[in-house]
Structure formats: structure tokens, C-alpha cells
Amino acid sequence: MKKIVIALLVTFGLTTIVSAEIGVKVGVSAQIGEMETSGKEVSSDGTTKTSNTEEALFATGGFFIEKDLAFLPGPFGRLSVGFDNIAHDLDLGSQSNYRERTLGAGGAVELKSKHTLEAEVTDFETLYATLNVTDWLYLKAGTVTVDVTTKFNGTSTSSYPTSHSLDGTVLGFGVEKSSDNGMFFRLEFNDYSIDGKSIVNAGTDSKFTATLNDVSGSTGRIAIGKAF
């Protein structure tokens, strides 16, 4: 998906002769914000290990492409639809905990062990719509898909899936300043709500299920682009 969108951006960016406005905007953005979540690992015998709520600051750079719907009648003509994604992978770091001595799925005694999970966001795609309230103020709503790759280090009897896709929503608002040559600048606030996910241990120690609770947070975003 990244390669397709980048190709579209390059195509529009290299267009120097436009016979008429086509209602397309392309640009780049940077955002900084904070997300919070918690997680747990549950054993089939009812034992639960729950983490504290973790908060983390993060920053991303991305690109976007939009198309206005000015051809629609009435207030619908104030709508635009767009696609946004980060232009790089985002390292989420690692988290460790210690599992107490337990009985594995086959009844064997598992000694106390250290488990470490590393995570990296490889895609942060947003499909969204904006509504121009005025010439400079707009509202935004959309859906989010976050692709995460994880690496688990722990007991040899434990194995968790490494590729995960999380879905969520985004709501926001922003202000835009445009110039006569088509260049524009934006300031934007976004509020995210991303669904959590549960995964089952795929190793021989299959009595455990790890759960990431819902992720929530907000970001401030700046963007610059050009309208065609």
C-alpha cells in the first residue's frame, strides 16, 4: 500500500501543467502525541498478570493525499476524503515481566522466567473525511489501521504470533491557511481510540493468552502541502 500511495504522490507532484483545478491536495505532515494502554497475560487456571497503564510519547512523519467533493450539491460539497500514512517504521521499544513458577499445558513445572516483548509499528494508515466549517476551520473523522510487528523472548515453550493488525477511529479538528499559488499550511488536533487484541500462546505452553487492552491518546499535527 505504501508503494502505491507514494507513486500517486510522485505523479501528482510532478504535474506542472494543470488545465483546471482538479480538487486534489497532497502533502507531508509531522505529529507528536501521547498514547496509553495496559495489558495482561491470563492462564487457563485463572491466574492473571496485569500491567499498569503505560503512557508513552511518540512522534511520526507522514504523507497524505486528499480529494474534495465539491461536485456534490449543497453542504456535501464542503466534504473531502483522504488517505494518510506514516513514512517510516515506529519503534515502540520493549517491555519485560517475570512469570512465576507454573504448570505448563502438559503438566510440566515451568520455572520462574523473564519474558520480553519488542514491538514496532510498520503502518499507521488513516482513511478520513473532513468537513469545512468555514474557509479556515474543518472537522475530521476517520478509521485507523495499525500494523504492528512483535518479537517475543522468553521460555522455549512459549510462542506468540508476530504480526498484528489493530483497528480504531480518529476524531479531530484543524485550521488551514492557503495561498494563491495552491500551497497550504495546517494545524490539527486528533483524538485516537484503537481496539485492543488478544492472542493465544502458540507454543507447547498453550495455556496462556496475552491481551493488549484498548489504546487511546491524542496528537498535535502540522502539515504542509499543495492543492491542484
Give short role names for the model-derived ranges.
Residues 19-96, 101-107, 111, 219-223, ...:
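Short glycine/proline- and aromatic-enriched beta-strand/turn motifs that initiate or cap beta-hairpins
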